[in-house]
Amino acid sequence: MTIIPVNNTIMNSVTYVLYSEDVDYCVLIDCGEYETLKPMLDKMGKKVKAVLLTHGHSDHIYGLNQLLEAYPDVMVCTTEDGHREIQDAKLNFSYLHDDPFAVKGYKKKVLTDGQTVSFDGLEDIDVIATPGHDSSCLSYKLGMNLFTGDAYIPGVKVFYKFPRGNKELALSSYEMLANMQKEGFHIYCAHHTY
């Protein structure tokens, strides 16, 4: 399994491309700028099969509409709350920016804590609920790799003062993920460093 980080210009978010040479597709963790992703996807020659969202805030989904135009069969995977957020410009906070948007008309998969997501030819991905920054926050475990979104950015205090944030849950999720890092998991967070 190969993991490629793609740095986006909006809010320094990071999209991760997961793929294997053995299959003709890839899976994304979050979806940043499609203009940044497209050249890489074209060069790889792989179609996008699914996007696993760490949560539904606009900086993690702002390229999703363009991606879905190019790859209409993409499965968008997140919690029920996450699906509500991406379908509403106010809930995903894009209304605060120049170009508010909502994502509509897509293939939906609801993820829950403890679930395992499987794709032929790729390692299984374990879903871990990590609420607090937002109620929709998920982290993904792939072998000894841990994709934490905004729930855990090493050395950065978790921000939980959004309408669907929760201080106690945020601190609990942060502590759990920090302990996993101490156990040897490699952290792939959604901003700053990876």
Question: In which residue ranges do the predicted regions lie?
Answer:
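Residue-level marker for buried hydrophobic side chains located in beta-strands
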Residues: V27, L52, V76, L146-T148, ...
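Short Gly/Pro-enriched turn/cap motifs at secondary-structure boundaries
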Residues: V6-N8, K107-K108, I128-P131
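Active-site HxH/HxHxD metal-binding segment of metal-dependent hydrolases
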Residues: E33-S118
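Metallo-beta-lactamase
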Residues: D124-Y194
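Short catalytic-loop micro-motif centered on adjacent basic/acidic residues
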Residues: C26-I29, A50-L52, V127-A129
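A structural micro-motif
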Residues: M1, K46, V74, E123-I125, ...
